[in-house]
Design a protein with these regions (language model features):
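Active-site-proximal helices and loops of the catalytic beta/alpha 8
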Residues: 10, 130-191
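Generic enzyme active-site microenvironment
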Residues: 50, 127, 163
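Substrate-binding/active-site clefts of carbohydrate-active enzymes
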Residues: 1-122, 130-153
Length: 191
Protein backbone atom coordinates (compact mmCIF):
# COMPACT_ATOMS: atom_id res chain seq x y z
CA UNK A 1 0.00 0.00 0.00
CA UNK A 2 3.03 2.33 0.22
CA UNK A 3 4.39 1.49 -3.23
CA UNK A 4 7.20 -0.55 -1.70
CA UNK A 5 8.04 -4.07 -2.80
CA UNK A 6 10.22 -6.65 -1.09
CA UNK A 7 9.98 -4.51 2.05
CA UNK A 8 10.95 -6.25 5.28
CA UNK A 9 12.41 -3.37 7.26
CA UNK A 10 15.88 -3.18 5.73
CA UNK A 11 14.86 -1.06 2.74
CA UNK A 12 15.02 2.42 4.22
CA UNK A 13 13.39 5.47 2.72
CA UNK A 14 14.34 7.81 5.58
CA UNK A 15 17.09 7.67 8.17
CA UNK A 16 15.65 9.91 10.88
CA UNK A 17 12.36 8.26 11.82
CA UNK A 18 11.47 5.06 13.61
CA UNK A 19 9.10 2.93 11.58
CA UNK A 20 5.56 4.19 12.38
CA UNK A 21 4.15 0.69 12.83
CA UNK A 22 6.53 0.15 15.77
CA UNK A 23 4.46 2.62 17.82
CA UNK A 24 1.28 1.64 19.62
CA UNK A 25 -0.80 4.04 17.54
CA UNK A 26 1.49 4.45 14.53
CA UNK A 27 0.51 8.07 13.97
CA UNK A 28 1.28 11.71 14.78
CA UNK A 29 4.92 11.19 15.61
CA UNK A 30 4.07 8.79 18.43
CA UNK A 31 6.81 6.43 17.30
CA UNK A 32 9.50 8.99 18.18
CA UNK A 33 8.13 9.65 21.67
CA UNK A 34 7.58 5.95 22.32
CA UNK A 35 11.11 5.13 21.16
CA UNK A 36 12.56 7.72 23.55
CA UNK A 37 10.51 6.26 26.40
CA UNK A 38 11.62 2.75 25.47
CA UNK A 39 15.30 3.76 25.56
CA UNK A 40 14.81 5.48 28.94
CA UNK A 41 13.14 2.37 30.35
CA UNK A 42 15.93 0.09 29.10
CA UNK A 43 18.59 2.40 30.48
CA UNK A 44 16.80 2.49 33.85
CA UNK A 45 16.95 -1.33 33.84
CA UNK A 46 20.69 -1.23 33.00
CA UNK A 47 20.24 -2.37 29.40
CA UNK A 48 22.03 -0.62 26.56
CA UNK A 49 20.30 0.01 23.23
CA UNK A 50 22.14 -0.85 20.02
CA UNK A 51 20.33 0.33 16.90
CA UNK A 52 20.52 -1.77 13.74
CA UNK A 53 21.12 0.75 10.93
CA UNK A 54 21.02 0.33 7.16
CA UNK A 55 23.03 3.02 5.38
CA UNK A 56 24.29 0.84 2.53
CA UNK A 57 21.18 0.99 0.30
CA UNK A 58 17.61 2.28 0.09
CA UNK A 59 14.22 0.97 -1.00
CA UNK A 60 14.58 2.65 -4.40
CA UNK A 61 16.11 -0.49 -5.91
CA UNK A 62 17.94 -0.48 -9.24
CA UNK A 63 17.46 1.82 -12.24
CA UNK A 64 13.95 0.41 -12.74
CA UNK A 65 12.91 0.97 -9.12
CA UNK A 66 10.54 3.61 -7.76
CA UNK A 67 11.57 7.19 -7.03
CA UNK A 68 10.90 7.55 -3.31
CA UNK A 69 13.61 9.83 -1.95
CA UNK A 70 17.25 10.30 -2.99
CA UNK A 71 16.87 9.29 -6.63
CA UNK A 72 14.58 12.25 -7.16
CA UNK A 73 16.84 14.69 -5.32
CA UNK A 74 20.41 14.04 -6.49
CA UNK A 75 20.85 10.56 -7.92
CA UNK A 76 24.56 10.76 -8.78
CA UNK A 77 25.56 12.06 -5.34
CA UNK A 78 23.46 9.69 -3.24
CA UNK A 79 24.06 6.47 -5.20
CA UNK A 80 27.08 4.69 -6.59
CA UNK A 81 26.57 4.51 -10.35
CA UNK A 82 28.41 2.44 -12.93
CA UNK A 83 31.18 4.63 -14.37
CA UNK A 84 30.75 3.53 -17.99
CA UNK A 85 26.93 3.48 -17.88
CA UNK A 86 25.77 5.87 -15.13
CA UNK A 87 22.12 5.03 -15.66
CA UNK A 88 22.90 1.75 -13.86
CA UNK A 89 23.54 1.41 -10.14
CA UNK A 90 26.52 -0.32 -8.60
CA UNK A 91 25.05 -3.04 -6.40
CA UNK A 92 27.25 -4.32 -3.57
CA UNK A 93 24.18 -4.98 -1.43
CA UNK A 94 21.93 -7.33 -3.40
CA UNK A 95 19.11 -4.77 -3.34
CA UNK A 96 19.77 -3.02 -6.64
CA UNK A 97 21.68 0.00 -5.31
CA UNK A 98 24.49 1.09 -2.99
CA UNK A 99 24.65 4.47 -1.29
CA UNK A 100 27.63 6.60 -2.28
CA UNK A 101 29.52 7.34 0.93
CA UNK A 102 32.35 8.75 -1.18
CA UNK A 103 30.05 11.74 -1.72
CA UNK A 104 30.39 14.37 1.02
CA UNK A 105 26.64 15.00 0.78
CA UNK A 106 25.75 11.38 1.47
CA UNK A 107 28.38 11.01 4.17
CA UNK A 108 27.01 14.13 5.90
CA UNK A 109 23.49 12.68 5.75
CA UNK A 110 24.64 9.44 7.37
CA UNK A 111 26.64 11.24 10.06
CA UNK A 112 23.74 13.59 10.82
CA UNK A 113 21.47 10.57 11.16
CA UNK A 114 23.89 8.78 13.49
CA UNK A 115 24.24 11.89 15.65
CA UNK A 116 20.45 12.26 15.77
CA UNK A 117 19.99 8.71 17.04
CA UNK A 118 22.84 9.12 19.53
CA UNK A 119 21.97 12.55 20.92
CA UNK A 120 18.19 12.86 20.50
CA UNK A 121 17.20 9.24 20.93
CA UNK A 122 20.06 8.36 23.32
CA UNK A 123 21.05 5.01 21.78
CA UNK A 124 24.30 3.47 22.99
CA UNK A 125 25.65 2.19 19.71
CA UNK A 126 25.00 0.95 16.22
CA UNK A 127 25.14 -2.30 14.29
CA UNK A 128 25.92 -1.42 10.65
CA UNK A 129 24.25 -3.65 8.07
CA UNK A 130 26.63 -4.68 5.25
CA UNK A 131 29.34 -2.42 6.68
CA UNK A 132 31.84 -3.35 3.97
CA UNK A 133 29.68 -1.45 1.46
CA UNK A 134 30.09 1.64 3.64
CA UNK A 135 33.87 1.26 3.80
CA UNK A 136 34.46 0.87 0.06
CA UNK A 137 36.72 3.25 -1.80
CA UNK A 138 36.35 3.37 -5.55
CA UNK A 139 36.65 -0.41 -5.77
CA UNK A 140 37.93 -2.07 -2.61
CA UNK A 141 37.10 -2.05 1.09
CA UNK A 142 39.61 -0.23 3.26
CA UNK A 143 40.26 0.56 6.92
CA UNK A 144 41.18 4.07 5.81
CA UNK A 145 37.90 4.72 4.01
CA UNK A 146 36.30 8.13 4.30
CA UNK A 147 33.38 6.65 6.24
CA UNK A 148 35.51 4.86 8.84
CA UNK A 149 37.80 7.87 9.19
CA UNK A 150 34.83 10.19 9.72
CA UNK A 151 33.38 7.86 12.37
CA UNK A 152 36.77 7.73 14.12
CA UNK A 153 37.05 11.53 14.17
CA UNK A 154 33.50 12.22 15.32
CA UNK A 155 33.51 13.21 19.03
CA UNK A 156 30.08 11.66 19.65
CA UNK A 157 29.87 8.59 17.43
CA UNK A 158 33.43 7.38 18.08
CA UNK A 159 32.54 6.98 21.78
CA UNK A 160 29.65 4.61 21.12
CA UNK A 161 29.56 0.87 20.53
CA UNK A 162 30.17 0.20 16.83
CA UNK A 163 29.41 -3.21 15.37
CA UNK A 164 30.09 -4.10 11.73
CA UNK A 165 28.41 -6.75 9.68
CA UNK A 166 31.75 -7.06 7.85
CA UNK A 167 30.76 -8.13 4.37
CA UNK A 168 28.96 -7.10 1.21
CA UNK A 169 28.38 -8.78 -2.15
CA UNK A 170 31.21 -7.05 -4.01
CA UNK A 171 34.62 -8.46 -4.81
CA UNK A 172 36.72 -8.59 -1.64
CA UNK A 173 33.66 -7.76 0.43
CA UNK A 174 34.18 -10.38 3.15
CA UNK A 175 36.15 -8.39 5.73
CA UNK A 176 35.90 -10.27 9.03
CA UNK A 177 38.84 -9.18 11.20
CA UNK A 178 39.64 -6.15 9.06
CA UNK A 179 37.62 -3.35 10.64
CA UNK A 180 39.43 -0.78 12.83
CA UNK A 181 40.27 -1.45 16.47
CA UNK A 182 37.29 0.36 17.98
CA UNK A 183 34.84 -1.79 16.02
CA UNK A 184 33.29 -5.11 17.01
CA UNK A 185 32.34 -7.47 14.18
CA UNK A 186 29.69 -10.06 13.51
CA UNK A 187 31.17 -13.30 12.27
CA UNK A 188 28.55 -14.84 10.00
CA UNK A 189 30.50 -18.07 9.59
CA UNK A 190 30.74 -18.60 13.35
CA UNK A 191 26.97 -18.80 13.88
Amino acid sequence: DKGLSNYWGYNSIGFFAPHAEYAATGQNGDQENEFKELVKAYHKAGIEVILDVVYNHTAEGNHLGPTLSFRGIDNHNYYRLEQEHPIYYTDYTGTGNTLNLLSSRTLQLVMDSLRYWATEMQVDGFRFDLASALARGLYDVGKLSTFLDTIHQDPVISQLKLIAEPWDLGEGGYQVGNFPVLWAEWNGKYR
